[in-house]
Structures are given as C-alpha cells and as structure tokens.
From Swiss-Prot:
(2R)-2-phosphoglycerate binds at residues 167, 343, 372-373, 394. CDD domains: enolase. Its EC number is 4.2.1.11. This is Enolase. Belongs to the enolase family. Pfam families: Enolase_C, Enolase_N. It comes from Shewanella piezotolerans (strain WP3 / JCM 13877). Its cofactor is Mg(2+). It is an enzyme of class 4 (lyase). Transmembrane segments: none annotated. One of its GO terms (cellular component) is cell surface. The keyword Cytoplasm applies.
Length: 433
C-alpha cells in the first residue's frame, strides 16, 4: 500500500507574480509527489472557485493562506493513512469534505494541488513515469500519443495590454514527423515572427503566455503577420503549419447590448454576424480550430456556429464547458461545439478531469489539454496529454520558462516512449482527419 504519511501545503508564486498553492504528498518508503495549482485570467463564470484570502494588505488580496491552511489541516487529517494509488477515493474525500458545488470552502487550488501531488507520489511508489500512472487511472494502460501543440505566438485580449481583442493566435506544426520536429518548426516561426513585427515597427514584448503582444490595427492583421512569418521560416501555411484561434469571446461580449464588441478595430457584431466574421477568416486563412468563438452563455449562437462550421472546423469549448461533465453533457446532447479544452483547475481534481476527457472522447469530441495564463514550473499537463492520448496540447509560446517547461517535458517523454507514442499531427484535429 502506498500509505500517505504526511501532506504539506505552501504558498508559492505563479508566472504573473501572484500566489498559488503548492502541495507535497509523502508516502511510507520515502516516496513523494509535489504539484502546484495554476490560475486563469479569462475565466468561465462556472469554474470551480480559486480561493483567495481577500486581505488587501497582503498580495493585494490574492494571498492563498486560507487554501494552504486547508491543505495542512482538514485535508491532511483526512488523507493521512490512505492509499495514494486510490486516486478516485482521495479526490472524493476532499470533494465531500468541501461540501460545496464549486469547491468554495477549501478552494479548487487547494484540492487540485493535493490531487496532483498524490498522483505523482503514487507514480513514484509504483516506479513508473507520471504519464504511465495517469494512463492506468484513465483505464487505458500503455496507450499513449504525443500531442499536436497549439502554440500561442500572438497574445491579445486578457493576456496582453494591447489593442487586439482576440486572445490567442496559434500555430500548429501539423506537417512534422514527430513532436520534436514540431517544436523546432514552432520555434523557427516564433523567431521569424519577431523579425516581421520588428520590421513593421511593432513591439516584440510578450504577454502572459509568451507570445508577442503587438498593437495591431485589426485581428486579421495578426493572422497576416503570422502568414508572412511562416513563409519567411521556410514553411507552407496550410500544409506544414495550420492556424488556430482562441477568441475568449466572453471577454468582449456586451451582455446588456447583446453584441460582440471588437473595440480594437471599432466593429460590433450580433451573435450570427460574428459567426460569419469567423467563417470569413477561415476562408482567408487555414484556421482549423476556434476556441470560445462566442460568449459562454450564448448557446443558441454556438448551435448556429456548430451548424455553420462544425463539419470543417474544430470548435473548442473552454469557458463554454469549464471541464465540467454536467455542462459538457448538455453541449453534447444539444449539438454544441465538437471539442473540449481541458483545464485541471476549472474543475479542481484529477479524477473529475479524467471523467471529462472520457465523456468527450466517448461522444466523438476531440480533447485539447491546456495550461492557464498564470502558470508555474509544474509540467503535469504534459504527462496528462500523453497519458490520456488526448491528441492536442495548448501550453503557450516558445518563450517564458513556465511555458517551455511543458514542451521540455514532452521532449523527454517522446524520447522515452519513441514509437509507442505516435505524433499524428492534423489527424488529431476535429474535421481534419
């Protein structure tokens, strides 16, 4: 038995200079797992609660000492003596102790940190890599794949202080033979883009996720700059590299007026008009994936969007589904979107995360594993992507060590697994196989 003998919680810093929760789970025999909770900037209203202290005199109210206290107190008391390999049992104990619908008592940041640390400790006890233990928990032992990365090379919206409304413009190295080559292609385009932006007199400062954050005249101009960068790097857009966008449309949706307000370019749209605006972009550029193309509450609009583009474009629900099986089931039943973004901390435990992945795959949805804009050096999502054979990962640009840490872990995993973890490129994207 992988008996838990101690649990330690602490307050550490994330990549935005805000506190977050880190947890250690110690087992008999000297085995240990450590994990940290990430934090989002553009968040869905139905996400599990990230518990903050609210003390304005300390970290501007963003301290997490209450969540840390829960880890070191109630959670530790309940889990010490339990088996770390019994992930579902551990997570359910924490969920039941919290007793709220959205983990508001302890905080999803507390529960998640312990949940992931327990999984890492269990993997250490078993003497296997974390991705292998996750595959076991997922009921798919030995089934792996290397994910196609969505690399966020131009940041806008809530992730940058600029005039670009759409939050993320991403490249996907679909023409690569393996993950390592895909990463190289992405890095080369990233550096090529820096030269393109500089030549046009734009800033090459980076946003929260490591992509550039230039003040561009329109959202389409971001795509145009990437097009030039891809060509200058020696690749063919649409063949070697495809494009993806995260609109994070809830951030520029005016609920009172019921319009989508692209203030950066002075344009306003109804729900239907914005769908056609996005469709026009997919006709002009090889965009194969659009995330959160409408406000999280605009289900009628999403139904229209799915009918309009769902057979050819991957439509990913992030704020729309918030890694929640109840909300995802509603989407599946009503023909809303065709893919889900998976973020641990939206739901707050590894077990619930795996349940969302399974539900999505069983319904024929694709799965994209994702970081948050507030990250740490913790690279657990790399193991999650491989261990669930998710197929796609979104973990920022080729800049900032909080992003690159995940890519480096994927390089190590590919080196270990070789042909046991195929890289399928464009075949992983809904509507493109």
């Amino acid at each position: 038995m992988a008996k838990i003998i101690n649990i330690i919680g602490r307050e550490i810093m994330d990549s935005r200079g805000n506190p977050t929760v880190e947890a250690e789970v110690h087992l008999e025999g000297g085995f240990m797992g450590m994990a940290a909770a990430p934090s989002g900037a553009s968040t869905g209203s139905r996400e599990a609660l990230e518990l903050r202290d609210g003390d304005k005199a300390r970290y501007l109210g963003k301290g997490v000492l209450k969540a840390v206290e829960a880890v070191n107190g109630t959670i530790a008391d309940a889990l010490i003596g339990k088996d770390a390999t019994a992930q579902a049992e551990l997570d359910q104990i924490m969920i039941d102790l919290d007793g709220t619908e959205n983990k508001a008592k302890f905080g999803a940041n507390a529960i998640l940190a312990v949940s992931l640390a327990a999984a890492k400790a269990a993997a250490a006890f078993k003497g296997v890599p974390l991705y292998a233990h996750i595959a076991d928990l997922n009921g798919t032992p030995g089934v792996y794949s290397m994910p196609l990365p969505m690399m966020n090379i131009i940041n806008g919206g809530e992730h940058a202080d600029n005039s670009v409304d759409i939050q993320e413009f991403m490249i996907q190295p679909v023409g690569a033979a393996n993950f390592r080559e895909g990463l190289r292609m992405g890095a080369e385009v990233f550096h090529s883009l820096a030269k393109v932006l500089k030549a046009d007199g734009h800033s090459t400062a980076v946003g929260d996720e490591g992509g550039f954050a230039p003040n561009l005249p329109s959202n389409a101009s971001a795509l145009a700059a990437i097009k030039v960068a891809v060509a200058n790097a020696g690749y063919e857009l649409g063949k070697d590299i495809t494009l993806a966008m995260d609109c994070a449309a809830s951030e520029f949706y005016d609920k009172e007026a019921n319009i989508y307000d692209l203030k950066g370019e002075g344009k306003k749209f109804t729900s239907e008009e914005f769908n056609f605006f996005l469709q026009d972009l997919t006709k002009e550029y090889p965009i194969v994936s659009i995330e959160d193309g409408l406000d999280e509450s605009d289900w009628d609009g999403f139904a229209h969007q799915t009918k309009l583009m769902g057979d050819k474009i991957q439509l990913v629900g992030d704020d729309l589904f918030v890694t929640n099986t109840k909300i995802l089931k509603r989407g599946i039943d009503n023909g809303i979107a065709n893919s889900i973004l998976i973020k641990f901390n939206q739901i707050g435990s590894l077990t619930e995360t795996l349940a969302a992945i399974k539900m999505a795959k069983d319904a024929g949805f694709t799965v994209v594993i994702s970081h948050r804009s507030g990250e740490t050096e913790d690279a657990t999502i790399a193991d999650l992507a491989v261990g669930t054979a998710a197929g796609q990962i979104k973990t920022g640009s080729l800049s900032r060590s909080d992003r690159v840490a995940k890519y480096n872990q994927l390089l190590r995993i590919e080196e270990q697994l070789g042909e046991k973890a195929p890289y399928k490129g464009l075949k992983e994207v809904k509507g493109q196989a």
